Regions:
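Short, charged recognition helix plus adjacent turn
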Residues: 68-101
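Residues within the helices of the helix-turn-helix
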Residues: 13, 24, 53
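Hydrophobic micro-packing sites on short alpha-helices
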Residues: 48-56, 66
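Residue-level signal for the short linker/turn that defines the boundary of a DNA-recognition helix
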Residues: 10, 20-21, 47-50
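A short, Lys/Arg-rich alpha-helix, primarily the initiator
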Residues: 1-18
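The alpha-helix within a helix-turn-helix
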Residues: 16, 27, 56
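Short alpha-helical DNA-recognition segment
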Residues: 22-38
């Protein structure tokens, strides 16, 4: 069974290590108990949205980036291809077809 809390914990730990921060530093910046954050990173505790937001701010990473990474990891575990970003422009070939009509 896929546990989202494990994937979330892995993402948070990976980001923290990439940023070169200790668990203690992030817990302090986020005003979260060190032991609790450790349990979240190990996938043993579910984090509330408020805790996630505080940790994201402490890591200086948008919460949306964290959640997107978790979603991609869960999709991979489920055997789905990673989600592709939706383009914010209309491809030229569609514009030329539209203009011709």
């Amino acid at each position: 069974m896929i546990l989202v809390r494990r994937e979330l914990g892995d993402v948070l730990r990976d980001l923290r290590l990439q940023k070169g921060q200790t668990l203690r530093q992030v817990a302090s910046k986020a005003s979260v108990a060190l032991g609790y954050l450790s349990e979240v990173e190990r996938g043993q505790k579910e984090a509330s949205s408020e805790i996630l937001f505080a940790v994201a701010e402490a890591l200086d990473v948008p919460l949306s980036v964290i959640l997107s990474e978790v979603g991609e990891r869960v999709a991979a575990l489920e055997g789905f291809a990673p989600l592709r970003p939706i383009p914010d422009t209309v491809p030229d070939e569609f514009l030329s077809d539209f203009a011709a009509k």
